[in-house]
Amino acid sequence: MKNEMLALILAGGQGTRLGKLTQNIAKPAVQFGGRYRIIDFALSNCANSGIDNVGVITQYQPLVLNSHIGNGSSWGLEGINRGVTILQPFSATEGNKWFEGTSHAIYQNIDYIDSINPEYVLILSGDHIYKMDYEEMLQVHKDNMASLTVAVLDVPLKEASRFGIMNTDSNDRIVEFEEKPEHPKSTKASMGIYIFNWPRLRKMLVDSENGNIDMSDFGKNVIPAYLESGERVYTYNFNGYWKDVGTIESLWEANMEYIAENNPLDSRNRSWKIYSKNHIAPPNFISEHAEVTDSLVVDGCFVTGKVDHSILSANVHMKQGAEIKDSFIMSGAVIGEGAKINRAIIGEGAIIGNNVVIDGTDEIQVVGYNEVVGVSNEN
């Protein structure tokens, strides 16, 4: 049975720029917005776009990510002839081989892709915050009779040198690709989202492997090769909210934008829901001494302090006299009596001792996964 389009989510990144937050978990598994993990956005987009089969390619610290995704039922992706498949590096005849790049990860999973037998493959990154209708992108791909379509976002010219830039003609056909150009000619930045005709991509990957030609990365190798060979390569112009949360600053900023009154992500739009794995938690407890303003407090929280313009994820315990402002507190964290937290990200299960001050006025502060700050080990 042939499936029209298979989605492949690249979720093996370490996310080194997130520092302590990714010491024990993969970047796509990092929490976001109080009740989500970053990969929930790509998975929810797939579900909302009517994609039945999704392969999630993992590598670095996959335990939390694998447990979170499970069989895909939280996104309605389980059932006959549909589902989510976790794809990890495996030992082949030549021995264990890590993925060497984005397109190499696809090549290593050719057997899985062939078992689905798609006409098209949709390549996604598992570490961006956005909503996109991939079915709409596929229609543009078909209308242009394209071999490859690249989703692009218009960025300010002063920021264009940070991205892979697509230079196009008047019909949105890509005529040149520049990787982080010093003097960009265009502001169309690649989002790392691609639709390929699978038979053509498959042939290129197999031929390059057999010929010992480096085709390990989509941006550095595959897209330039497509353009050089005269393939029909087009852009899909995306105009919605999109955030690369690859740094501490951008992750904090995205969470603060998420709780804005005019949320640019439009998270309250029920026609395009963001799904996640459900965890049963007791109701919140907000004491008579607590003061909560302009904040998101998720189930299971115990709040007896002051919270202003912040996110408290599930099961956060905030003791009396503590103050939290402009911060993102991940699930299971404990904030001690009289602690003061400003402009910070507090990791899952972290413990902040009594009267500890964490001030990110000059630079966003981070407390890592299960990290303990200001608590004596003597007891």
UniProtKB/Swiss-Prot annotation:
Pathway: Glycan biosynthesis; glycogen biosynthesis. It catalyses: alpha-D-glucose 1-phosphate + ATP + H(+) = ADP-alpha-D-glucose + diphosphate. The keyword Nucleotidyltransferase applies. Its EC number is 2.7.7.27. GO terms for biological process: glycogen biosynthetic process. One of its GO terms (molecular function) is ATP binding. InterPro entries: ADP-Glc_PPase, ADP_Glu_pyroP_CS, GlgC_bac, GlmU/GlgC-like_hexapep, NTP_transferase_dom, Nucleotide-diphossugar_trans, Trimer_LpxA-like_sf. Alpha-D-glucose 1-phosphate binds at residues 164, 179-180, 190. The keyword Nucleotidyltransferase applies. Keywords: ATP-binding, Carbohydrate metabolism, Glycogen biosynthesis, Glycogen metabolism, Nucleotide-binding, Nucleotidyltransferase, Transferase. NCBIfam families: glgC (TIGR02091), PRK05293.1 (NF003670). Homotetramer. Involved in the biosynthesis of ADP-glucose, a building block required for the elongation reactions to produce glycogen. Catalyzes the reaction between ATP and alpha-D-glucose 1-phosphate (G1P) to produce pyrophosphate and ADP-Glc. Belongs to the bacterial/plant glucose-1-phosphate adenylyltransferase family. This is Glucose-1-phosphate adenylyltransferase. The lineage of its organism: Bacteria, Bacillati, Bacillota, Bacilli, Lactobacillales.
